[in-house]
From Swiss-Prot:
Gene3D superfamilies: Ribosomal protein L25, beta domain, Ribosomal Protein L25, Chain P. It comes from Hydrogenobaculum sp. (strain Y04AAS1). SUPFAM superfamilies: Ribosomal protein L25-like. Part of the 50S ribosomal subunit; part of the 5S rRNA/L5/L18/L25 subcomplex. Contacts the 5S rRNA. Binds to the 5S rRNA independently of L5 and L18. Belongs to the bacterial ribosomal protein bL25 family. CTC subfamily. Pfam families: Ribosomal_L25p, Ribosomal_TL5_C. The keyword Ribosomal protein applies. Keywords: Ribonucleoprotein, Ribosomal protein, RNA-binding, rRNA-binding. This is Large ribosomal subunit protein bL25. GO terms for cellular component: cytosolic large ribosomal subunit. GO terms for biological process: translation. InterPro entries: Rbsml_bL25/Gln-tRNA_synth_N, Ribosomal_bL25/Gln-tRNA_synth, Ribosomal_bL25_b-dom, Ribosomal_bL25_C, Ribosomal_bL25_long, Ribosomal_L25_dom, Ribosomal_uL5_bac-type.
């Protein structure tokens, strides 16, 4: 799993005006909470937040004073325009042995069915797993090159690491390679003709 190191700045109880002033300085308020630990109020640099990986799971090593806290990114709240972070929640995993996480799926290869004119329809882009937070997989790689026309890939078909517990319905559909419309129409016409004979 990827690790990202950030440095936090201590934050005393502050007013709305104080927080607004800090945002102008390139800082965003952070709340750190977790099992059996005291909540911590801090600030982090917005540029550090922007530099964090996207589309993968990662561990944050948050340095506050002389202490380094292992954390997961739980939530980012944005302003009404949707592009300005106004608050960040980090989950301190120091005392956690298992946690639920969303792990992204990475699809590799071109399905056989797509090469034959089918359409790839992806229903799930991530799955929920229960795992030791220190061993969270960055992603689950899924080879879809053998999925044929009309083929369906279910959650149970995924290669889940042995140290993870699946929290999804095994029968849930991950993706489908739909047949071309003309093929469907032709099959329907044949069925209608057969029914009238």
């Amino acid at each position: 799993m990827k690790r990202v190191s950030i440095e936090l700045l201590e934050r005393e109880a502050s007013t709305k005006g104080d927080k607004k002033s800090k945002r102008k300085e390139g800082l965003v308020p952070v709340e750190i909470y977790g099992k059996g630990v005291q909540n911590i109020h801090a600030y982090m640099r917005i540029k550090d937040l922007a530099a964090m990986p996207h589309g993968t799971t990662f561990l944050i090593e948050a340095k506050l004073g002389n202490e380094v806290l292992p954390c997961l990114l739980k939530d980012i709240q944005y302003g009404w325009l949707g592009d300005n972070p106004v608050h960040v929640d980090l989950y301190n995993i120091s005392n956690v042995t298992e946690t639920d996480v969303e792990v992204p799926l990475e699809f590799v290869g071109t399905p056989k069915g797509v090469e034959l004119g089918g359409t790839l329809e992806i229903h799930l882009h991530s799955i929920e797993l229960k795992v030791d937070p220190r061993n969270i997989p960055e992603k689950i790689t899924v080879d879809i090159s053998n999925v044929d026309l009309g083929g369906v890939l279910h959650v149970k078909d995924l290669n889940i690491p042995a140290n993870c517990r699946l929290m999804e319905d095994p029968e849930e559909v991950v993706l489908v390679v739909a047949e071309p419309e003309e093929t469907k129409e032709g099959e329907e016409e044949q069925a209608q003709e057969a029914a009238t004979k």
